[in-house]
Every structure is written in C-alpha cells, then in structure tokens.
C-alpha cells in the first residue's frame, strides 16, 4: 500500500512534537510525556513495550528512522482497517458504520451516549464523519493494529478523558466502589423521578380535576367548557387544585419508585442500555408501573375521592382517610379498583416507556448529540403519552368508577373490572370507556413532557450515564 506525502509529513510533525530537546532522538521520558498528552496508555509497562517494538538498535532511545519505520508500517495497517470499516466506500466513516463494527466484534456499549462519545473521540471537527487523517491521529502509535484491539482501545481510551492514574489507564473499580456508584445512581433516579412527578402534577392539576369529572359523568359526554365551569363553581380557583396535595404526596414517591424500579429491571435484562429490545423495555415499564402503583394505591383512592366529591365533603387528606375507613369499617375501599388499575398500568406504563425510549434513542442516533434537546424530549414524551393512553384509558375509567362508587358523585355499583366494562358499554356505549380522554390528553401530554424533561435533566446534571458507562 502506497503512502502519500501527507502521511510522511504527519510522521515528521508527530516526531518533532515528541522530541522536546530537538536532538533527533526520543528518550523514555519524552515518549512517556508524549503518550500522556496524546491520551495513550503510558505506564512503565506500556513504554517498555513500545521501546521493544521500535528501538531496534537497543540504545534506550528512538531515532527518527526507527520511529518512521514503525509509524509508516502502522499507517499501512490502519488504512486496511479503515477501508474494512468503510462499508459504503465513501472515504469516511459515519456513526452507523462504527456501530455495526462494534456489534460484529461483540464489544459492549452501555448506551447511545457512549457510542457518540466514542465517535467524537476521533471526529475532531464534529462534521459527523471520520476521515482517515482523524483516524490516523489517534491510533498511529498503537503497538498492534488489528481491528479488535483498535476498537477496544478506542472505546476504553475515553476513560482517559476523566484523568490518569500514574500515567496509565484508570484501574477497574473494586466491587465495593461499583456497588456504591450503583446505589448513588439509583438514588439519583429516584430523586429525579420524585422531583419530576411533583413538577408535572402540580402544573397540570386543573386538567386532572376536569378529567376526573368527565370520567365520573354517567350521562351524555359534557364539553370541556362545561367541565371547567363546574370546577370553578365548586370552589373557585382552588377548586381546580382540590386533591392535588394528595396527588403530590402520592405521585412524588410513586414516580421515585417507578423510575428506580424501571432502571433496575432494565439492568436485569442487560448491563448495556442499548442492547435492550423493545419487548424488554415494555416489560421493564410495566413492572415499574405495577410496583409503584400498587405500593401507593391507597393515596390514589384518597386523591380521586378528594377530586370527585363536592367541596366540604372532606376536610383534607387525613379526614378523607378516616371517613372512608369508618364508612366501610375495613381497608377494602382503599384497594377497590386495584385490579383495574394494574390492568390499565401494564399496557399504559409498558407502552409509554417503550415508545419514549425507542424515540429518544432514535433521536440520539439521528442527531449525533449525546443528549436530546428539551424540544426533542417533548416530542418523544408526547408521542409515548398518547400511545400509552390509547391502550390503557378504558381501564382507567373503570378504575375511577370503582374507587368512587357509593359516593355522592357515583351511585353506580360494580363488582369488578369486567362488570364495570360491561355495564359502561351497555349503558353508555363504547364511547363511555373514553370519557374524559380529551382533557386527559391535554393533561398527560404536558405532564409526561415535564416529567421526562426534568428526569433527563437530573440524570444529565448528575452525569449518571457517564458514571454508569465507566462502571460497565
């Protein structure tokens, strides 16, 4: 393979940059310092290995001729590897070609963010294409130029961006540190979920109240304007926020449990996030939804009762708990509708998380950015919210009626989920199962958008993705 003048000029400039005293020879110290700056492993063992391969006359230093022979031979090998990776023969490598090569070599990647960091490690001018000059600059001094070693070094060399340990790679974390990091990440997920839940529910509380009023209406569907007027008449501005405190008390820990569980279940399927299938994301989302919803379901009952009843029926959360318990002399009313709720949560939460993550990862790959923008997250969250609601909404309607049955706003009696579905369809038609879905969309789309934007923002602020990438 013929080298061009550009390659020879590159070798001369590289040698001169390492030869600090300009005496035409590279000492062990100059090589070590140069490797350190180039972010190449530079432990004593690495330097010794380099000298063994390059210092042919064994005088303890590297002349320009020795350096030139070694690097030119490496450049020839690098060109062969580059052409092997360049499957579309464009003369450059794009992120999809790199991803396919990594998959073929079975080298693990934690996430799309790691793939993009890896790509940008070489793509210095950020044009989303790696030309041979960029490829050569990072890899020319590797002692071996086979594809497996190149990709592994390229991937692992990202660790050097965070610092060095005695001039070499940072050693692997011991198990205790990995566990501590995993615990910190779990706490971060839960904190992010909690704050996201608080922010989203408070900002959309009026729409939640209107949605519940529509769900509990047994007659002809009422218009949004009529529902808003009824809410305002029953308590003024405060009427729109009735039940919101119970909602916050419920949703903040519920969101914390949901996101913490979701990330945990994903890890059971695969250490690397980008290896997960859509089915595995669906299962992770469903399990997270069921665990979080079941854990705090009594608060869901109180929230719905506070939102549904007329002003003055209950004097706050604890009074609502007390009156519900006294009226039926058991804890059963606090779990009435749980079956319908779980039935609704499985497809709703599963589809929601599956679609959201699918779209988010697509955006990351398409844009080449490590993190989607707030606008892009809004589109992902909105789409996933609509998909989740379409499959789970009828069960939410039945759940709301099961929870509030026997109250002043819902005198109808249901024995369970199937009975509820049957009676609603019989008396109100199939449209009865979708009563309140318009205000539900109006509430859930901004609510989910706020939730995911805050959640992803927290993860980014605490650098969770990068931390996990280092430990996996």
From Swiss-Prot:
Q: Which residues lie on this side of the membrane: Mitochondrial matrix?
A: 208-242, 303-330, 399-441
Q: Which residues lie on this side of the membrane: Mitochondrial intermembrane?
A: 1-189, 264-281, 352-377, 463-472
**How does the record say this protein sits in the membrane?**
Multi-pass membrane protein
| Positions of Ca(2+) 2 binding | 55, 57, 59, 61, 66
- Positions binding Ca(2+) 1 in this chain are 19, 21, 23, 25, 30
Alphabetized SMART domains for the sequence: EFh
GO biological process entries: ADP transport; ATP transport
Give the EF-hand domain ranges: 6-41, 42-70, 73-108, 110-145
rRNA processing: present as a keyword of the record? no
Chain's role:
Calcium-dependent mitochondrial solute carrier. Mitochondrial solute carriers shuttle metabolites, nucleotides, and cofactors through the mitochondrial inner membrane.
Family the entry assigns = Belongs to the mitochondrial carrier (TC 2.A.29) family.
Q: Which PANTHER family match?
A: SOLUTE CARRIER FAMILY 25
Protein name (Swiss-Prot/TrEMBL)? Mitochondrial substrate carrier family protein C
């Amino acid at each position: 393979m013929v080298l061009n003048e550009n390659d020879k000029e590159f070798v001369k400039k590289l040698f001169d940059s390492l030869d600090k005293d300009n005496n035409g020879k590279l000492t062990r110290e100059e090589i070590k310092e140069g490797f350190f700056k180039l972010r190449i492993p530079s432990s004593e063992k690495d330097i010794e290995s380099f000298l063994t391969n390059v210092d042919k006359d064994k005088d303890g230093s590297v002349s320009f001729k020795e350096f030139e022979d070694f690097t030119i031979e490496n450049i020839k090998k690098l060109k062969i590897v580059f052409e092997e990776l360049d499957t579309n023969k464009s003369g450059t490598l794009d992120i999809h070609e790199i991803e396919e090569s990594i998959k073929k070599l079975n080298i693990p990647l934690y996430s799309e963010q790691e793939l993009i960091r890896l790509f940008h490690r070489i793509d210095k001018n950020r044009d989303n294409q790696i030309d041979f000059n960029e490829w050569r600059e990072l890899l020319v001094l590797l002692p071996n130029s086979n594809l497996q070693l190149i990709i592994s070094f390229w991937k692992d060399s990202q660790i050097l961006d965070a610092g060095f340990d005695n001039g070499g790679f940072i050693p692997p974390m011991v198990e205790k540190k990995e566990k501590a990091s995993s615990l910190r990440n779990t706490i971060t997920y839960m904190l992010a979920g909690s704050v996201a839940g608080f922010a989203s529910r408070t900002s959309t509380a009026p729409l939640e109240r209107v949605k519940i009023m529509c769900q509990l209406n047994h007659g002809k569907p009422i218009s949004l304007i009529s529902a808003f007027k009824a809410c305002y008449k029953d308590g003024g501005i405060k009427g729109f926020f009735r039940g919101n405190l119970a909602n916050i008390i419920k949703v903040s820990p519920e969101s914390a449990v949901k996101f913490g569980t979701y990330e945990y279940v994903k890890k059971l399927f695969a250490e690397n996030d980008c290896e997960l299938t859509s089915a595995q994301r669906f299962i992770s989302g469903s399990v997270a939804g069921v665990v979080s919803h079941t854990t705090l379901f009594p608060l869901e009952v109180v929230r719905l009762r506070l939102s549904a009843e007329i002003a003055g029926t209950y004097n706050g959360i604890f009074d609502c708990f007390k009156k519900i318990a006294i009226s039926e002399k058991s804890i059963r009313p606090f779990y009435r509708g749980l079956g319908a709720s779980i039935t609704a949560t499985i497809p709703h939460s599963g589809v929601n998380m599956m679609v959201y993550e699918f779209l988010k990862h697509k955006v990351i790959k398409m844009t080449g950015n490590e993190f989607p923008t707030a606008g892009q997250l809004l589109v992902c969250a909105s789409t996933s919210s609509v998909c989740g609601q379409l499959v789970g909404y009828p069960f939410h309607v039945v759940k709301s009626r099961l929870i509030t049955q026997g109250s002043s706003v819902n005198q109808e009696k249901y024995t369970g989920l199937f009975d509820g579905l049957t009676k609603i369809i019989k008396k109100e038609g199939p449209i009865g199962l979708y009563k309140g879905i318009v205000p539900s969309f109006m509430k859930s789309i901004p609510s989910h958008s706020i939730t995911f934007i805050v959640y992803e923002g927290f993860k980014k602020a605490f650098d969770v993705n990068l931390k996990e990438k280092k430990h996996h």
